[in-house]
Amino acid sequence: SAASDVYKRQDHIYGIDPFNEVDSPDWSEDFLANVSSKIYESIHQVDSAAQWLQMTWMFFYDKKKWTQPRIRSFLKAVPDNKLILLDYYCDHTEIWRNTEKYYGNPYIWCYLGNFGGNTTLTGNVKESGARLENALINGGGNLKGIGSTLEGLDVMQFPYEYILEKAWNLNVDDNKWIECLADRHVGCVSQSVRDAWKRLFNDIYVQVPRTLGTLPGYRPALNKNSEKRTSNVYSNVELLEVWRKLNEAPSDRRDAFRLDLITVGRQVLGNYFLDVKMEFDRMVEAKDYQALKACG
């Protein structure tokens, strides 16, 4: 086709996401099967080697409507091995576990980890790693790879570094892996840096990713502090101790370690700002102008 000539397409993969956060006009199994069948036929007519790449966010987002019989009808209407599925949000829900491994269709296990490019210390990293290891063992021969589906780049690197390395290093002891990461980041063996990273791994990076951030990143408003989007499951005092341990390192010459210092420090200060803002709101509501003036 003219489009193929212009773009010189060689991979034969076509990303198509019908019903993504959109209701189907008809929820009958026959209608859903007809939709997926016609989608595949349309790309096959243009490219006989076409493969359809489909994210499965809709099965999670509209899980009450996307029942197992409906999912099965939608998937099985496409010829075998012509529909590749992205198990989109495995850090929260693994769809393969509830669909008989996507009824035999090839799929990719994906770690989302970030919504909207928000920069915050979040991600149930250890739990997600265990889920991935289980998938690699029990996910079936149609599990074809590991991927990430983050909604923004230049976000927290650590979760992706840990998760994606499991493609090469399955069943590596987590404690040893974290120590190696700490040594690599700082450029030497530093017990304080190792301790800091173990606390980050075991106690800080434990929250299932959602649209989280720190208050300075949100539009300012009195008595509105985006509590649902700034809440943490750890104590900021604990994170401050992690930052202190990182600052005990003998060297900060490596960029990776400087990024660690910035990442943790930014989160500590961002979390603390929430406390300051709540106190500010209290003073304004009470018209305590002397207290406000005293705080500068």
Report each predicted region and the residues it spans.
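Catalytic-core regions of glycoside hydrolase
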Residues: 1-197, 206, 223-240, 285-294
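Extended, positively charged loop/linker patches that create polyanion-binding surfaces
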Residues: 200
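Histidine-centered catalytic/metal-binding microenvironments
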Residues: 227-296
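Long, charge-rich alpha-helical interaction segments
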Residues: 209, 213-222
